[in-house]
Amino acid sequence: MPKRLIVTADDFGLAVPVNEAVELGHLNGILTSASLMVTAPAAADAIERARRLPRLGVGLHMVLVDGQPALPPEQIPDLVAADGRFSRDPFRLGARIFLSSRAQSQAEAEIRAQLTAFRRTRLRLDHVDGHHHFHLHPTVQAILIRLAPEFGIAAIRVPDEPAAVRQHAGASQRMRDWLAAFPLRDRAPAMKRRLARADIRFNDTILGLADSGHIDSARMRALLAALPDGVTELYVHPATRRWGEIDALPDAYRPEAELAALVDPSVRAAVEASGATLTTFQELANPPAVASAESALEESGLSGARS
């Protein structure tokens, strides 16, 4: 089975340093896609940059935890805290959505609003994933599958990082222990079955789960050396510099190092040595020749698909 690699930057739109890193990582490195937070502070800047990058696969980074909703807080009271933002506790919110039909209706309304906001950008929807992987929640999965025909959701990320890959790449024991205790860790196989039945594409494997936020060049090369067959998504959180919100995170969170890894020639060489083809979710449906032709048309201004 051939190896295909999607390299995605999450949190596109969160801040200008993130958006700058997405553009640099795509133009000068191995980054092939980005996941857009449509309600984030720098979303407008991210959208403008994405319009200049026709080969960048842009998906929706659906936010139901730790972020700003698309709907007014009074329309989704079961999902937000007193400040009008989503809760930072995914486990409590997940239980509420699972047990409450009212919360489920509110979650569907909010997801619909975010998909509608993405549609208004006129960017092609490459994929959908979830902030803090909250789309692993079975109710949220069901909502996304139900909305897929209406919004053209053709691919959804499955956060499935095999333990053998983590161990081979040298993930820390602390992170392996944390992932072993992750409440939704066993949802990935069921998620794949549900997506396959709905004819929605997904990655076979994900890389970066155990190393989220601190994948430097050495770690990225180690992950690429362990690249399995099939479709793998490597996700990262790059930025050109730290900013106010991120300063509150531990020093181990190193977005600048992740950008440096994306543009490191030794990392590109590791991709080539792995035998993998860099791609996007969209290209899994469109043959490369077709995708290249479409990109050429967009860059020449002859395609109506470009915003």
Give the positions of each predicted feature.
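Alpha-helical and His/Cys-centered functional microenvironments
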Residues: 135
